[in-house]
Amino acid sequence: MKSISMLTLAASVAFAVTAGQAVAAGDPAAGEKVFNKCKACHQVGETAKNAVAPELNGIDGRKSASAEGYNYSEPFKALGITWDEAQFKEFIKNPKAKVPGTKMIFPGLSSENDQANVWAYLSQFGADGKKK
């Protein structure tokens, strides 16, 4: 009986880890839909340009406050990070908590699925705006 309980526990842990990895991977198509909330200010793709907010092409591996020609807030200039999935998720969950004084008015994405999906969508775009 004890071996059955251990087997059940091991299977539960394996399932939880697998489920967590599925969330972490993100779905670019779902992320594109969530990104519609961001399009009022941000752009991606071959014709993207800075507008109310910086364009987000090539965000994966890009230094913060580095979109050429965009006038970032002083707190954002001082952030000094390189964007990766973990940094993006921490920021987009609550932008004003991560960067007090940011000009970004968006309140954030509380859903970890939405965060992962938007990252999966954005990270498809290279610095030239073409999908990788």
Curated annotation (Swiss-Prot):
Entries under SUPFAM superfamilies matching the protein: Cytochrome c
Keywords: Electron transport, Heme, Iron, Metal-binding, Periplasm, Signal, Transport
Gene Ontology terms: cellular component: periplasmic space
Ranges of residues in domain Cytochrome c: 26-126
Post-translational modification: Binds 1 heme c group covalently per subunit.
Signal sequence coordinates: 1-24
Domain of life of the source: Bacteria
Binding residues annotated for heme c, in chain numbering: C38, C41, H42, M104
Matching InterPro entries: Cyt_c-like_dom (IPR009056), Cyt_c-like_dom_sf (IPR036909), Cyt_c_1A/1B (IPR002327)
Listed PANTHER family: CYTOCHROME C
Protein name: Cytochrome c-554
Phylogenetic lineage: Bacteria, Pseudomonadati, Pseudomonadota, Alphaproteobacteria, Hyphomicrobiales
